C-alpha cells in the first residue's frame, strides 16, 4: 500500500467516525454534512478512471456502495419520521470494510448499488461547467462516445407495503420539447426534496429515453417513490430534471426541470410545466422554459393496503 493510499484510507476512516459520533450525539446537521462530504469523496474515487489507482474495479464498486449507504443514512436523518430506513448500527458496520478495503473479499452486508458520479454534483454545479447558451437552439450534432453504457439508469424497486400507508408509482410517459429530436441520450433524474432542497429519498435516474418523435421524448418508465406518502415532510416536492449529452462539451447537461407538489399527488394522469435551468430545488425563482404548450406528462398510481 502506498503512502498516498494509506493516508487516503485514514482520512476516510476519520471522516466516517466523525459522522457517526455526531450522529450518536444527536448533532444531526453536522452528521449529515460529514456523511455527504465523505460520500462525495468516495463516489469520485469509485468512478475514477486514472490508471495509478491502487483500487481494483471490485474494490471501487464496494467504495461506491459505502457511499450509497452514507446517502441513505443522511436521508434517514432528514426524515421527520421515527422509523429510520438505514440505522446508525448499520452504518457502523461499514467502518471495518472501509478500513480494510484492499483486503476485503466478503459479500457486502447491504443490498445497495453505487450511485452514478453525476449524482454528487451540487445544485447548479453542473450548469457552471458550461457557458450560457440559447436553449432554444440545437443540442449539437455527432454521436456520443458510448454514453448509454455510462448511464444505465438507477431505478429502485417498490418499497414493502405497510398497513394504512400509501406508496406512489409515477409513470413518466413523455416530455414535450421544441427540439426533442436533437437531444442525445436523454434521461430524467427524479428526486424528492424538502423546502430547503435537501433529499428525502435516494435519487433515481431513468434509463435513456425509449424513442423521440416530433416534439416529444418518450420514456414510458415507472418510478417507485422511496418513501410512503404519509411520511413525506410538509412542503416536499418531487423533481424531474431532464438531462442530455452534449458531445461538443463531452458532458451531461440539465436542459430543464419540472416538479410536483404534495397536493398534486392523486391517481391518474397529470401534466406539469417545464422550467428553465438551473434546477431551483427551493422553488424561489422559477422561470418557465417556454410559452408553448409543452409539458411533462405523468401518470400516478397509489397503492394502499
From Swiss-Prot:
Keyword Metal-binding carried by entry: no
Q: Does the keyword Repressor apply?
A: no
Any one Gene Ontology cellular component term annotated for this protein: cytoplasm
- InterPro entries attached to this UniProt entry: Aida_C (IPR025939), AIDA_N (IPR023421), AIDA_N_sf (IPR036818), C2_domain_sf (IPR035892)
Q: Name one GO biological process term.
A: negative regulation of determination of dorsal identity
Report residue spans for region: Axin-binding. Answer: 153-220
Record GO terms (molecular function): protein domain specific binding
Highest taxon of the lineage: Eukaryota
Which residue stretches does the UniProt record annotate as biased composition, category Acidic residues? 128-137
Question: What sequence ranges are listed for the domain C2 Aida-type?
Answer: 156-303
Q: Give start-end ranges for the coiled-coil region(s).
A: 27-62
Stretches the record annotates as Disordered: 128-150
Task: Give the keywords, sorted.
Answer: Coiled coil, Developmental protein
**Pfam family, any one:** Aida_C2
Q: Which family does it belong to?
A: Belongs to the AIDA family.
Task of the protein = Acts as a ventralizing factor during embryogenesis. Inhibits axin-mediated JNK activation by binding axin and disrupting axin homodimerization. This in turn antagonizes a Wnt/beta-catenin-independent dorsalization pathway activated by AXIN/JNK-signaling.
Q: Indicate the quaternary assembly.
A: Interacts with AXIN1.
Name this protein carries in UniProt: Axin interactor, dorsalization-associated protein
Amino acid at each position: 500500500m502506498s503512502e498516498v493510499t494509506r493516508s487516503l484510507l485514514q482520512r476516510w476512516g476519520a471522516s466516517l467516525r466523525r459522522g457517526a459520533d455526531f450522529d450518536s450525539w444527536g448533532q444531526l446537521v453536522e452528521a449529515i454534512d460529514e456523511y455527504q462530504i465523505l460520500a462525495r469523496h468516495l463516489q469520485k474515487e469509485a468512478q475514477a478512471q486514472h490508471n495509478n489507482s491502487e483500487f481494483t474495479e471490485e474494490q471501487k464498486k464496494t467504495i461506491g456502495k459505502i457511499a450509497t449507504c452514507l446517502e441513505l443514512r443522511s436521508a434517514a436523518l432528514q426524515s421527520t419520521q421515527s422509523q429510520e430506513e438505514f440505522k446508525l448500527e448499520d452504518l457502523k458496520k461499514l467502518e471495518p470494510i472501509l478500513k480494510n478495503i484492499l483486503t476485503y473479499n466478503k459479500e457486502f452486508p447491504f443490498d445497495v448499488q453505487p450511485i452514478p458520479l453525476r449524482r454528487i454534483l451540487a445544485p447548479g454545479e453542473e450548469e457552471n461547467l458550461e457557458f450560457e447558451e440559447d436553449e432554444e437552439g440545437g443540442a449539437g450534432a455527432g454521436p456520443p462516445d458510448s454514453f448509454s453504457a455510462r448511464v444505465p439508469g438507477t431505478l429502485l424497486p417498490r418499497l414493502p407495503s405497510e398497513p394504512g400507508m400509501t406508496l406512489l408509482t409515477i409513470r413518466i410517459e413523455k416530455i414535450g420539447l421544441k427540439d426533442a429530436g436533437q437531444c442525445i441520450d436523454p434521461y430524467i433524474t427524479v428526486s424528492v426534496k424538502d423546502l430547503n432542497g435537501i433529499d428525502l429519498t435516494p435519487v433515481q435516474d431513468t434509463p435513456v429515453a425509449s424513442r423521440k418523435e416530433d416534439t416529444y421524448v418518450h420514456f414510458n418508465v415507472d418510478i417507485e417513490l422511496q418513501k410512503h406518502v404519509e411520511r413525506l415532510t410538509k412542503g416536499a416536492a418531487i423533481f424531474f430534471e431532464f438531462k442530455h449529452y452534449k458531445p461538443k462539451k463531452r458532458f451531461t447537461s440539465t436542459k430543464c426541470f419540472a416538479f410536483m407538489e404534495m397536493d398534486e399527488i392523486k391517481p391518474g394522469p397529470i401534466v406539469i410545466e417545464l422550467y428553465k435551468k438551473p434546477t431551483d430545488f427551493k422553488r424561489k425563482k422559477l422561470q418557465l422554459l417556454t410559452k408553448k404548450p409543452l409539458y411533462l406528462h405523468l401518470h400516478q398510481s397509489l397503492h394502499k393496503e
